[in-house]
Amino acid sequence: MRPDKGYDLTEKELKALEKRIYDSYKEAYDGLTDIIKEYFAKFADRDASEKARLDAGDITEEQYKHWRLAQIGRGKRFEALRDKVAERMTNANAAAVAYVNDATPGIYSLNRNFAAYTIEQVTGDVGFDLWDEQTVKRLIVEQPELMPYYPPKRALKRGIDLAWGKKQITASVTSSILQGKSIKHMADDLQSRIVTMNRDSAIRTARTAVTGAQNAGRMDSYFAAEKMGIKCRKEWMATLDGRTRHSHAMLDGEVVDNDKKFSNGCRFPGDPQGRPEEIYNCRCTLVSVIEGIDTSNGKRRDRYGIMPNMTFAQWEKSKRGEGYLQR
């Protein structure tokens, strides 16, 4: 089954979110250039003296390597470098989390509305209200578990903090020394590896949060439909390409009651209550299965008459009191 319009609109929002995150880390990367160059330029002078001793046979390769490692273990200059880089990365990570939190309410409302649209496309106007992201933001205050959200304290528990960053920086330089890399390679590796690792992790976190918000929003409409007397169930729809995990490809097309979990233990794709291996970086979505109705050729009625094949944009317009057929 091809992804629906709601999925496509969500992907568009995700691309914009990923760009904001990418730009944030690009700024952090650029800001580290002078800091790292300055440190390794000074380190190069001292390193050249020790290398000369090695070449002259005054010390062994092992002694030279231990000297280099000692500069990390007790070097104040390295500690200053490490702290500056870690602080930059922590700030970039905090910005990425803020971007995710800013985007997900809009994703939730978009998919809540789209799910309502797909239901009304075959049942007629049953009174769904049009939501916006401000509505969702107000609900999050009352119901914190409504959708994925990363407050500062929770973000720190996820390892996005200074202590974690310092360990990664030390590990990067230590690895370069043990591999016998040149000063230039050490500097390049530190700058690219730390930024790329943090950026890629942030983008995967964004994808996970967006998928969770997308499908939590759809579930909201499914439960609302049931309260209106519409019998519907939920169907797992996988993104069938080479990047989809095998277990989710096997879930494609599985249908369960709205209050039940799918066979992988998730209520919906990106379920924050699911196991990490089932939700992290998930790109699947939900569709509604309405009992006794073939949705493949549905027609719509708004207050102004029957409207076949109404688009999502037209449906939104009608909900604002601007009937598509009224024109």
Question: Where does each model-flagged region fall?
Answer:
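N-terminal leader/targeting and assembly helices and adjacent pre-domain segments
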Residues: 1-196, 289-327
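Acidic, glycine-rich two-metal-ion catalytic cores of nucleic acid-processing enzymes
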Residues: 200-301
